[in-house]
């Protein structure tokens, strides 16, 4: 106890095994011999009472006494060597004098000193604490800078992560007249168009979460949160035939989607082009034209541009020798009912199937047209009476499927030569979005979603060249039956419309998954060439800041526009034919029916029997193992 003093630093061992320094604040002598120590821990001060034995054990450097002098040590350690009994007898007889042997002094080993280890551990903890504080300071500084870059934006963190993500993308977008490549025209084409933000959305500081790095790919940045509430981006990548950004006009969209189908109908085929997407995503704008005011202008819609190209193609060689006439019809499908938009009063029509299994819309008018101006008049008449309503997503939402058909007939016998169906589908809706709407609006949404589901199944069956098409599932597919049946004479183009807003990200993903599902099951698709979504899984703010600038973004490939699809499809067809051949029932073996044949067979030589057996085995293998 004499070597200890108040405010002296000593090492102590905690109950969990930790060893650190503590300060003596009280010494109790007598029988108890307790030492009271305390030490700071975080924002508090802790204390403990220790017996003297533990203090001595943990601090041997304090209680080590100085070594004795050499003479005393030598005298203390000198001992007489004890001889064995024979040795004692020899000493007693005087034959051997006693010899004092000095034992070598024992080496005193100092207890291990833990001072260096504890000091290093404390230094390491201090450095880690400083690094954490520096990282927290940098994070606070980054947050302040992010707020200052986009003041007043409640989603500034998401906006910054998306901005940093887009800086790593190389943009190569579709532009009208800037490419010399051949426009792909497959049996099923799927294109996506992203609409720009509206003025109201810009005023509300809506965030654009859709990026288009190339003319075939797009990425949807979905904001998510970890368990610890740290925000991050989950990037969903898609690949289609063509992707149009918000700067593309209707003319550019038409050039890559519907225009390649004009030549197909003049060659005697059936073509279908339809716009699909969430309500308010721009389907009617794309198909019908702009809205300069309350009324729609049909001058720059796909309807009018297709009609203009039809009349211009009609005058070119060799189609001018076919002597074709152009007819137009315009009708809508509201729920399960069909209405003619070109007749006064918009009468309801019946959809029936004749004896030739051809679906006929009874009473539908097909007006003959001579030029584009007459087509525009019909479009304005039909758009003025089309059914629309108010929803939570769009103040003027189309509640029906509008079908505008351009029909080519021969002038001699009025025989159908080709048909082009341009469809403005009603917007798909979720039940959670219109749960507060009235019963009629919910029923409309239910019928719309049902018809869109059947439409997708018909397109998938068309892509698989299936013998069964579920076109009777809805009035829409029933009316368009001749646009799905016909093999290579039928071509379809789908324009998926998406909204870039943050609050519509779920609708956008549903639309893109719908379109991708249609595309990936087509005949010419190449599933084996799907590339992995490298560096596109999920990205947090810290990951984006630390990422290298050489990060690449290559989304999945599930498109029929990729090269080599035809060979893959041919190989698939050959394999299917081989399987069909192998599954054909083999012919029954023939047996001799008369005794004469049995005698003849018994009388044949062994060589002939062996040859017959070999031939039979070869025929069996040829039938079952081509």
Swiss-Prot record:
Stretches assigned to the Kinesin motor domain: 187-521
Main location: nucleus
Keyword DNA damage: no
Pfam families: KIF2A-like_1st (PF22923), Kinesin (PF00225)
Compositional bias ranges of the Polar residues kind: 72-96
Regions of compositional bias (Basic and acidic residues) in chain numbering: 113-150
Role description: Required during anaphase to drive sister chromatid separation to actively depolymerize kinetochore microtubules at their kinetochore-associated plus ends, thereby contributing to chromatid mobility through a 'Pac-man' mechanism.
Name of protein: Kinesin-like protein Klp59C
Species of the source: Drosophila melanogaster (Fruit fly)
């Amino acid at each position: 106890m004499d070597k200890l003093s108040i405010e002296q630093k000593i090492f102590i061992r905690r109950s969990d095994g930790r060893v650190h320094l503590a300060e003596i604040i009280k010494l109790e002598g007598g029988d108890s011999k307790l030492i009271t120590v305390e030490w700071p821990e975080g924002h508090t001060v802790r204390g403990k009472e220790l017996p003297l034995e533990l203090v001595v054990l943990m601090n041997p450097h304090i209680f080590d006494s100085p070594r004795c002098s050499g003479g005393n040590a030598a005298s203390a350690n000198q001992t007489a060597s004890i001889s064995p009994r024979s040795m004692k007898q020899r000493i007693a007889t005087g034959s051997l004098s006693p010899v004092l042997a000095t034992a070598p002094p024992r080496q005193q080993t100092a207890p291990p000193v833990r001072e260096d280890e504890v000091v290093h551990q404390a230094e390491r903890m201090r450095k880690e604490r400083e690094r954490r504080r520096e990282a927290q300071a940098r994070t606070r500084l980054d947050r302040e800078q992010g707020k200052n870059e986009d003041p007043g934006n409640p989603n500034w963190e998401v906006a910054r992560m998306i901005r940093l993500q887009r800086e790593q993308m190389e943009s190569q977008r579709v532009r009208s007249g800037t490419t010399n490549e051949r426009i792909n025209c497959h049996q099923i084409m799927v294109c996506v168009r992203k609409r720009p933000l509206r003025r109201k959305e810009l005023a509300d500081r809506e965030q654009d979460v859709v990026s288009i790095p190339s003319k075939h790919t797009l990425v949807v940045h979905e904001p998510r949160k970890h368990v610890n509430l740290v925000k991050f981006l989950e990037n969903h990548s898609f690949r289609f035939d063509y992707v149009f950004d918000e700067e593309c006009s209707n003319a550019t969209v038409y050039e890559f989607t519907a225009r390649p189908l004009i030549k197909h109908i003049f060659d005697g085929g059936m073509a279908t082009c339809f716009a699909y997407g969430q309500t308010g995503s721009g389907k009617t704008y794309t198909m019908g034209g702009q809205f300069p005011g309350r009324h729609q202008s049909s001058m720059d819609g796909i309807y009018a541009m297709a009609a203009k190209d039809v009349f211009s193609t009609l005058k070119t060689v060799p189609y001018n020798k076919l002597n074709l006439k152009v007819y137009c019809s315009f009708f809508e499908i509201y729920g399960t009912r069909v209405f003619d938009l070109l007749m006064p009063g918009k009468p309801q029509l019946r959809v029936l199937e004749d004896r030739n299994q051809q679906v006929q819309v009874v009473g539908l008018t097909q007006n003959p047209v001579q030029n584009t101006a007459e087509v525009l008049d019909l479009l304005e008449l039909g758009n003025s009476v089309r059914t629309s309503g108010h929803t939570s997503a769009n103040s003027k939402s189309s509640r029906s499927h509008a079908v505008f058909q351009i029909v080519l007939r021969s002038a001699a016998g009025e025989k159908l030569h080709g048909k082009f169906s341009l469809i403005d589908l009603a917007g798909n809706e979720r039940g959670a979005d219109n749960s507060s709407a009235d019963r009629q609006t919910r029923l409309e949404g239910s019928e719309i979603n049902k018809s869109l589901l059947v439409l997708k199944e018909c397109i998938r069956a068309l892509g698989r060249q299936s013998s069964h098409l579920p076109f009777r599932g809805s009035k829409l597919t029933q009316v368009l039956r001749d646009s799905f049946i016909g093999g290579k004479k039928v071509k379809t183009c789908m324009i998926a419309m998406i909204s870039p807003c943050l609050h519509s990200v779920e609708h956008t993903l549903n639309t893109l998954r719908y379109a991708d599902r249609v595309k990936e099951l087509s005949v010419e698709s190449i599933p084996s060439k799907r590339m992995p979504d490298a560096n596109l899984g999920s990205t947090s703010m810290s990951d984006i800041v630390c990422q290298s600038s050489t990060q690449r973004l290559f989304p999945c490939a599930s498109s029929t526009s990729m090269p080599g699809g035809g060979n893959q499809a041919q190989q698939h067809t050959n394999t299917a034919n081989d399987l069909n051949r192998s599954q054909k029932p083999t012919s029954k073996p023939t047996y001799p029916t008369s005794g004469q044949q049995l005698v003849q067979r018994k009388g044949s030589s062994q060589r002939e029997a062996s040859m017959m057996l070999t031939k039979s085995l070869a025929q069996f293998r040829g039938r079952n193992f081509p």
